[in-house]
UniProtKB/Swiss-Prot annotation:
Name under which the protein is recorded: Centrosomal protein of 63 kDa
Keyword Zinc appears in the UniProt entry: no
Entry function: Required for normal spindle assembly. Plays a key role in mother-centriole-dependent centriole duplication; the function seems also to involve CEP152, CDK5RAP2 and WDR62 through a stepwise assembled complex at the centrosome that recruits CDK2 required for centriole duplication. Reported to be required for centrosomal recruitment of CEP152; however, this function has been questioned. Also recruits CDK1 to centrosomes. Plays a role in DNA damage response.
PTM info: Polyubiquitinated via 'Lys-48'-linked ubiquitin, leading to its degradation. Deubiquitinated by USP36, promoting its stabilization.
Native source species: Homo sapiens (Human)
Annotated positions of the Phosphoserine modification: 278
Subcellular location: Cytoplasm, Cytoskeleton, Microtubule organizing center, Centrosome; Cytoplasm, Cytoskeleton, Microtubule organizing center, Centrosome, Centriole; Cytoplasm, Cytoskeleton, Microtubule organizing center, Centrosome, Centriolar satellite
Subunit structure: Interacts with CEP152 and CDK1; these interactions recruit both ligands to centrosomes. Interacts with CDK2, CDK5RAP2, WDR62, CEP90, KIAA0753/moonraker and CCDC14. CEP63, CDK5RAP2, CEP152, WDR62 are proposed to form a stepwise assembled complex at the centrosome forming a ring near parental centrioles. Interacts with CCDC57; the interaction is required for their location to proximal end of centrioles. Interacts with FXR1; promoting its stabilization.
Single GO BP term: DNA damage checkpoint signaling
General remark: CEP63 and DEUP1 paralogs are both involved in centriole amplification: while CEP63 mediates mother-centriole-dependent centriole duplication, DEUP1 mediates de novo centriole amplification in multiciliated cells.
Family to which this protein belongs: Belongs to the CEP63 family.
GO cellular component: centriolar satellite; centriole; centrosome; ciliary basal body; cytosol; nucleoplasm; spindle pole
Length: 703
């Protein structure tokens, strides 16, 4: 094209003029070159941009695949951590089950030992009941054993209460752990569901994105194929344009040759014109001469007759001259005909060249139309590429959002797992602290039991003092009875002496009663101080409510007035047989009340001392049962044990029943109590086993 343009320009400069077709063709060639160069640069830039976009997308796909692999690895690690936590929980449940089995075995051993002891006691009691009438020493030994068994039963009751406390604490811990495990299981199920939903959504999004990427790849491949097809078409068009350029060059060469021929013909034409002009000049001169000659002939026609020889000669000369002019004219005419034919040929060649130029212009128009169509197709491709870019951006944003949601979900799961591990660690710490606190509680209870035993020893000493006072009161009552008998027998004694003796005896009794009241008040203050100390310690340990303790104190073991009006011999017999501190107190107080009741109303504080001693003794008896008033889970067992204790004390306070019936009743009540306690413990252990099995099943079901 450039060579053709240069040739046309050179021709224009050389020839000095350009036709309109050549100028239009030059402009078209320039526009075609500019458009082809512009489209070529645009296509190169677009192909380079598409290649860079494809490379960037491939890198993004690689990064996304690597991120997906990392997320899959993190999910696997999380699954492993969850499995490890489940294994740890299973191990903890197995340890708890083993501990429960050990406790059950220990309880079974205790049951067996207790049953053996009961059997031995029954055997010994049967053997002793057979030989009771024979040996009083055997009865005392049996009573001592009964007291020992009673103390053991109290110890067992204390141990039972301790075990009940431990079992209640374990049950509370187990319930709390079960609730927490259920909560954790629900949270884990929710988290698993969330993870599954997130995984499903991520998989669906990944599949959707992969399908979109496949579609984009297909569209890219189709675009590449279209680009290749367009490049092929462009190459074909370039080839056709090159062929057209070659044809144009050939035609330009032909035009140059024709132009050269035209120039040569024009020169020949000019020469011929010059020759024609010269011939015309000659012909004109000849005509002028001919006219002159004709004039001369006309002038000489008159002289023709005269001079006949001269006209003939002149005519011959004219004929010769005209023959020569006609030959010259024929040659000039032949040259003119040749120039006309050459002009016609040149015009035909020019028309052919114009037709070829028209065909070339038509082909150029077609090429321009095809280029415009290709430009429109390129615009469409650009629009499609922009749409694809927008879709790819949307896909990238969706992938980033999915990754962010997945990462946030993973971070939330990690935080929850760390929180759960911290909670489990805190629970382990609380379990260890509860174990330590239970051991401390056991130590405190043992110390309190020792203090209670020391106080019981002090109470026994006080009761011994009361026995001595009782003996003195009996001695005084005997003296008073003797005085009354002496009053009836000795009538000669004056009333004044009797009144004086009576007043002196009353004063002695009043002083002794005042001394006894002081001693009892001192003991009462000491007992109140000791009970307050015990109450404070029990409040620190067990935190009982004041209302329950007051009701328990007011309703527990209140002696009736009719229970202390039995025969003194029977109470002494019961006291010596069972060594009951309640019987001792009632025996020590009843003679004073019998002696001093008909004498004066001033000796009524003995009833207060009696109630005080009974209250203090009831305190000593009710101390093991008052330790666990705050336990709501074992209120039924506590009420039953308190009823059993009240029945036992009421049975002990009845001095009418003989020794054998009391012992058999005591043993039967102890057997019933122990059997009932063992049944409750077995039922509670079975419930714990069932609940532990439920928790284990739940954990296994979660797996």
């Amino acid at each position: 094209m450039e060579a053709l343009l240069e040739g046309i320009q050179n021709r224009g400069h050389g020839g000095g003029f350009l036709t309109s077709c050549e100028a239009e063709l030059q402009e078209l060639m320039k526009q075609i070159d500019i458009m082809v160069a512009h489209k070529k640069s645009e296509w190169e830039g677009r192909t380079h941009a598409l290649e860079t976009c494809l490379k960037i997308r491939e890198q993004e796909l690689k990064s996304l695949r690597s991120q997906l692999d990392v997320t899959h690895k993190e999910v696997g690690m999380l699954h492993q951590q969850v499995e490890e936590h489940e294994k740890i929980k299973q191990e903890m449940t197995m340890e708890y089950k083993q501990e429960l089995k050990k406790l059950h075995e220990e309880l079974c051993i205790l049951k067996r030992s207790y049953e053996k002891l009961q059997k031995k006691q029954m055997r010994e009691f049967r053997g002793n009941t057979k030989n009771h009438r024979e040996d009083r020493s055997e009865i005392e030994r049996l009573t001592a054993k009964i007291e020992e068994f009673r103390q053991k039963s109290l110890d067992w009751e204390k141990q039972r209460l301790i075990y009940q406390q431990q079992v209640s604490s374990l049950e509370a811990q187990r319930k709390a752990l079960a609730e927490q495990s259920e909560i954790i299981q629900a949270q884990l199920v929710n988290r698993k569901q969330k993870l599954e939903s997130v995984e499903l959504s991520s998989q669906s999004e990944i599949q959707h994105l992969s399908s979109k990427l496949e579609r984009a790849n297909d569209t890219i491949c189709a675009n590449e194929l279209e680009i290749e097809r367009l490049t092929m078409r462009v190459n074909d068009l370039v080839g056709t344009s090159m062929t057209v350029l070659q044809e144009q060059q050939q035609k330009e060469e032909k035009l140059r040759e024709s132009e050269k021929l035209l120039e040569a013909l024009q020169e020949e034409k000019r020469e011929l014109k010059a020759a024609l002009q010269s011939q015309e000049n000659l012909i004109h001169e000849a005509r002028i001469q001919k006219e002159k000659l004709q004039e001369k002939v006309k002038a000489t026609n008159t002289q023709h007759a005269v001079e006949a020889i001269r006209p003939r000669e002149e005519s011959l000369a004219e004929k010769k001259y005209t023959s020569q002019g006609q030959g010259d004219l024929d040659s000039v005419l032949s040259q003119l005909n040749f120039t006309h034919t050459s002009e016609d040929l040149l015009q035909a060649e020019v028309t052919c060249l114009e037709g070829s130029l028209e065909s070339v212009s038509a082909t150029c128009k077609q090429l321009s139309q095809e280029l415009m169509e290709k430009y429109e197709e390129l615009k469409r491709m650009e629009a499609h590429n922009n749409e694809y870019k927008a879709e790819i951006k949307k896909l990238k944003e969706q992938i980033l959002q999915g990754e962010q949601s997945y990462s946030s979900a993973l971070e939330g799961m990690k935080m929850e797992i760390s929180h759960l591990t911290q909670e489990l660690h805190q629970r382990d710490i609380t379990i260890a602290s509860t174990k330590g606190s239970s051991s401390d509680m056991e130590k405190r209870l043992r110390a309190e039991m020792q203090k209670a035993e020391d106080k019981a020893v002090e109470h026994k000493e006080i009761l011994d003092q009361l026995e001595s006072l009782k003996l003195e009161n009996r001695h005084l009552s005997e003296m008073v009875m003797k005085l009354e008998l002496g009053l009836h027998e000795a009538k000669e004694i004056s009333l004044a002496d009797l009144q004086e003796n009576y007043i002196e005896a009353l004063n002695k009794l009043v002083s002794e009663n005042q001394q006894l009241q002081k001693d009892l008040m001192n003991t009462k203050s000491q007992l109140e101080i000791s009970t307050q100390m015990c109450k404070k310690q029990n409040d620190r340990i067990f935190k009982p409510t004041h209302s329950r303790t007051t009701e328990f104190k007011n309703t527990e073991f209140k002696p009736t007035h009719g229970q202390h009006r039995h025969d003194g011999i029977k109470t002494e017999h019961y006291k010596t047989d069972l060594h009951s501190p309640r019987g001792q107190a009632s025996d020590s107080i009843n003679p004073m009340s019998r002696v001093l009741s008909p004498l004066s109303p001033q000796i009524s504080p003995c009833s207060s001392t009696r109630s005080l001693t009974s209250y203090s003794l009831c305190k000593t008896h009710s101390l093991p049962s008052a330790l666990d008033t705050n336990e709501a889970n074992f209120s039924d067992t506590m009420s039953e044990s308190m009823n059993d204790q009240e029945e036992f004390i009421s049975s002990c306070s009845l001095p009418v029943s003989p020794l054998g019936s009391i012992a058999t009743r005591f043993l039967e009540e102890e057997e019933l109590r122990s059997h009932h306690i063992l049944e409750r413990l077995d039922a509670h252990i079975e419930e714990l086993k069932r609940e532990s099995e439920k928790t284990v099943r739940q954990f296994t079901a979660l797996k």
